[in-house]
A protein has these predicted regions:
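Short loop/turn segments immediately following beta-strands, especially the blade-tip
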Residues: 23-27
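Residue-level detector of beta-propeller blades
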Residues: 31-33
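Acidic helix-start/capping segments at beta-turn-to-alpha-helix junctions
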Residues: 14, 36-42, 135-143
Length: 252
């Protein structure tokens, strides 16, 4: 893999895991490294409103302007919440970050050590010409078994929609094109032009409604995430990530 090749980030709340995937020379993405999430606030499920202490779930774009090397939490980047899907449902919130440290109010806290490496990988990709990094944030690994274990959860229609995007990525090993119409995500739409997030989907796109109207959380109180499994370790043995991390230490 080239040092400045594009990257993609995947987050799984229930497994307390953030993954960095990197593009190989064939244009496909492969898992580069996994990091334990030190803390996220809230429960499984999307962020709905300012002050609900939920960490977001969904598909987001990170651009160079969202990078913050001067964060009070060491290093950070903004997740991009709310995106077009969130706004179409009236969801509110701001400054939802992936950052260092181990304190979270609606964010994903990764520890300073891990964040140094994650931030460096994203920064190097931008220096290599990547315009935006796709962030895929999930409640858990989107397997049929995991969905079945959460059957009856009111967020299930939303999670089934996220699974469609997750499957699109894992099948092609490339970031899916993400659009929004009819207040729902659509992936790899075979159309030209922009879609109206609040308008019905055009012909040729399945318009079966999936995401329902905005509803309050059953509980807005923060809860501690599940304990780490202990199967994920850092620092990584990957030489690209190690060198980027070392360069960051010299800068910051």
């Amino acid at each position: 893999m080239d040092r400045t090749a594009p990257v993609l980030i995947r987050i799984y709340k229930e497994e307390n895991t953030l993954e960095v995937w990197k593009q190989d020379r064939n244009g496909k993405f492969a898992l580069l490294n996994s990091y334990p999430i030190c803390k996220f606030s809230g429960n499984l499920g999307p962020k709905l409103m300012q002050g609900d202490y939920q960490a977001p779930e969904g598909f987001y774009d990170i651009t160079p302007g969202q990078m913050n090397p001067n964060s009070s939490e060491y290093l950070a980047f903004n997740t991009g919440f709310p995106n077009a899907f969130d706004r179409s449902l009236g969801r509110t919130g701001s400054f939802l970050m992936v950052h260092g440290g181990c304190q979270s109010v609606g964010c994903y806290a990764m520890t300073d050590y891990a964040m140094e490496e994650i931030y460096g990988l994203v920064d190097e990709a931008f220096k290599g010409g990547q315009e935006k990094v796709q962030l895929q944030a999930f409640p858990f690994r989107m397997t049929t078994q995991n969905l079945a274990s959460h059957a009856g959860d009111p967020n299930m229609p939303f999670w089934e929609m996220l699974k469609a995007g997750s499957d699109a990525f894992l099948t092609t090993e490339r970031p899916p094109t993400v659009a929004v119409c009819d207040r729902r995500y659509v992936f790899n739409p075979v159309i030209s032009g922009n879609l109206d997030p609040s308008a019905p989907c055009p012909l040729g796109i399945d318009s079966t409604p999936i995401a329902g109207p905005l509803r309050p959380l059953q509980s807005a109180s923060a809860s501690a995430p599940p304990s780490n499994s202990g199967t994920i370790a850092y620092p990584t043995d990957d030489p690209i990530a190690q060198q980027i991390s070392e360069n960051l230490r010299k800068i910051y």
